[in-house]
Amino acid sequence: MSGQPKRLMVMAGGTGGHVFPGLAVAHHLMAQGWQVRWLGTADRMEADLVPKHGIDIDFIRISGLRGKGVKALLAAPLRIFNAWRQARAIMKRFKPDVVLGMGGYVSGPGGLAAWSLGIPVVLHEQNGIAGLTNQWLAKIATTVMQAFPGAFPNAEVVGNPVRTDVLALPLPQVRLAGRDGPIRVLVVGGSQGARVLNQTMPQVAARLGDTVTIWHQSGKGAQLTVEQAYAGAGQPQHKVTEFIDDMAAAYAWADVVVCRSGALTVSEIAAAGLPAIFVPFQHKDRQQYWNALPLENAGAAKIFEQPQFTVEAVADTLAGWSREALLTMAERARAVSIPDATERVASEVSRVART
């Protein structure tokens, strides 16, 4: 029996911030001979994405409760119980040596099912503020890890696993050496875009004129509107795309990034070694603010809460950063990153499976 490969079940779903780090760890362990299956939901992004990575996926029925009506809240205990039963049946079939919770609603019943079967639970919190699911799963987990300090009081800080092509980028002092001309500004709103970026950055471009060149990722369905906004501001030369398929190439091109501060975005920007202007999504727990704060504290970024993200403030900030200042910020960003996060998480999963 000792010669059989170890088995891991990854529990992650809903958003790329949960799924992509889970995939990085899964591939790392699969390369070491592990058998990996995924626990997710059939109506979220993992349903299509995970099988494309050569990983079998099992589904349970669960969704979030935030913003739902009274009837949904009253039905929640039964829904969670049913999801727990589904997850428990899946794990009894697969018999994982360890489960890895990377976040999303699926981790709740999945983690509870594993615990009830005596399967060790390893948690990884991607954000600077722990989500509700991980807050209570931490009470039964064998190990809890965190990407940023402060999500849990005593958890090891291991960073966020990021894509290998981002980690493979040359260091800032190599990549940016000898670069001149207009400052290259990469604007990233995510797959859904960010209205505040789409509305503000064309006017910022008008103020800065030919001192900047912009690559603006607008999000689904917004490309034409944003192109028209740049043209209306007298700046039609800037590049607008709905999506960016190769983020590593975009990071390599950029001198500075303007973006939201989701956990994975912040970790990728640090790993790439890039200065940033972060505009945290407004949420009551200020999760994205806390994600970005370590980079601002390191002198690698500037945070603008959304009400302060004005044309004047952003234009003045960008105009005030020389190429020398941007290189210093880029080096500070890289210094904050934890480029071996994938290996750290995988190593802890392996350790727990052996004990």
UniProtKB/Swiss-Prot annotation:
Gene encoding the protein: murG
Reactions listed under catalytic activity: di-trans,octa-cis-undecaprenyl diphospho-N-acetyl-alpha-D-muramoyl-L-alanyl-D-glutamyl-meso-2,6-diaminopimeloyl-D-alanyl-D-alanine + UDP-N-acetyl-alpha-D-glucosamine = di-trans,octa-cis-undecaprenyl diphospho-[N-acetyl-alpha-D-glucosaminyl-(1->4)]-N-acetyl-alpha-D-muramoyl-L-alanyl-D-glutamyl-meso-2,6-diaminopimeloyl-D-alanyl-D-alanine + UDP + H(+)
Keyword set, alphabetical order: Cell cycle, Cell division, Cell inner membrane, Cell membrane, Cell shape, Cell wall biogenesis/degradation, Glycosyltransferase, Membrane, Peptidoglycan synthesis, Transferase
A GO term for molecular function: UDP-N-acetyl-D-glucosamine:N-acetylmuramoyl-L-alanyl-D-glutamyl-meso-2,6-diaminopimelyl-D-alanyl-D-alanine-diphosphoundecaprenol 4-beta-N-acetylglucosaminlytransferase activity
UniProt entry tagged with the keyword Chloroplast: no
Protein's job: Cell wall formation. Catalyzes the transfer of a GlcNAc subunit on undecaprenyl-pyrophosphoryl-MurNAc-pentapeptide (lipid intermediate I) to form undecaprenyl-pyrophosphoryl-MurNAc-(pentapeptide)GlcNAc (lipid intermediate II).
Location(s) in or outside the cell: Cell inner membrane
Highest taxon above the source species: Bacteria
Family: Belongs to the glycosyltransferase 28 family. MurG subfamily.
Pfam families tied to this protein: Glyco_tran_28_C, Glyco_transf_28
One GO cellular component, as annotated: plasma membrane
Biological process annotations from GO: carbohydrate metabolic process; cell division; cell wall organization; lipid glycosylation; peptidoglycan biosynthetic process; regulation of cell shape
EC number(s) reported in the record: 2.4.1.227
SUPFAM superfamilies linked: UDP-Glycosyltransferase/glycogen phosphorylase
Family annotation (NCBIfam families): murG
Metabolic or biological pathway: Cell wall biogenesis; peptidoglycan biosynthesis
UniProt xrefs under InterPro entries: GlcNAc_MurG, Glyco_trans_28_C, GlycoTrans_28_N
Species of the source: Salmonella typhimurium (strain LT2 / SGSC1412 / ATCC 700720)
Chain residues that bind UDP-N-acetyl-alpha-D-glucosamine: 15-17, 127, 163, 191, 244, 263-268, 288
Protein name, UniProt field: UDP-N-acetylglucosamine--N-acetylmuramyl-(pentapeptide) pyrophosphoryl-undecaprenol N-acetylglucosamine transferase
Membrane topology: Peripheral membrane protein
PANTHER family linked to this entry: GLYCOSYLTRANSFERASE, UDP-N-ACETYLGLUCOSAMINE--N-ACETYLMURAMYL-(PENTAPEPTIDE) PYROPHOSPHORYL-UNDECAPRENOL N-ACETYLGLUCOSAMINE TRANSFERASE 1
